[in-house]
Curated annotation (Swiss-Prot):
Zn(2+) 2 binds at C75, C78, C103, C106. GO terms for molecular function: DNA-directed RNA polymerase activity; nucleic acid binding; zinc ion binding. The keyword NAD does not apply. Zn(2+) 1 binds at C7, C10, C29, C32. The modification Phosphoserine is found at S40. Belongs to the archaeal RpoM/eukaryotic RPA12/RPB9/RPC11 RNA polymerase family. This is DNA-directed RNA polymerase II subunit RPB9. It comes from the Eukaryota. One of its GO terms (biological process) is transcription initiation at RNA polymerase II promoter. A zinc finger (C4-type) spans 7-32. InterPro entries: DNA-dir_RNA_pol-M_15_CS, Rpa12/Rpb9/Rpc10/TFS, Zn_ribbon_RPB9, Zn_ribbon_RPB9_C, Znf_TFIIS. It comes from Saccharomyces cerevisiae (strain ATCC 204508 / S288c). DNA-dependent RNA polymerase catalyzes the transcription of DNA into RNA using the four ribonucleoside triphosphates as substrates. Component of RNA polymerase II which synthesizes mRNA precursors and many functional non-coding RNAs. Pol II is the central component of the basal RNA polymerase II transcription machinery. It is composed of mobile elements that move relative to each other. RPB9 is part of the upper jaw surrounding the central large cleft and thought to grab the incoming DNA template. Involved in the regulation of transcription elongation. SMART domains: RPOL9, ZnF_C2C2.
């Protein structure tokens, strides 16, 4: 959120300026000689949110990948107990650690937060 600062003496807007000698951020008035130190060295922050899918990279032959861990969690669709799992590919602050399971029988994708029986990893 952007906030504006105003001069205490003449009420004009203050502009950011770098104090190169002391390596700090200042706000100064262009009308009078008023200068104040910034509370934070941050002028602007731009957070990028990527819109990749949580299951990005899931392909038809995911079960043949020997690097993926296996589980015997029951598939809610076909009740098979053969699946592989991986963590969400989203890297955001508000994303919790959710495991995605891919059933090797029917390719159904389900998550660890669904109400299923306890998972035993192999």
């Amino acid at each position: 959120m952007t906030t504006f600062r105003f001069c205490r003496d003449c009420n004009n807007m203050l502009y950011p300026r770098e104090d190169k000698e002391n390596n700090r951020l200042l706000f100064e008035c262009r009308t009078c000689s008023y200068v104040e130190e910034a509370g934070s060295p941050l002028v602007y922050r731009h957070e990028l949110i990527t819109n990749i899918g949580e299951t990005a990279g899931v392909v038809q032959d995911i079960g043949s990948d020997p690097t993926l861990p296996r589980s015997d969690r029951e598939c809610p669709k076909c009740h098979s107990r053969e699946n592989v799992f991986f963590q969400s590919q989203q890297r955001r602050k508000d994303t919790s650690m959710v495991l995605f399971f891919v059933c090797l029988s029917c390719s159904h994708i389900f998550t660890s937060d669904q109400k299923n029986k306890r998972t035993q990893f192999s």
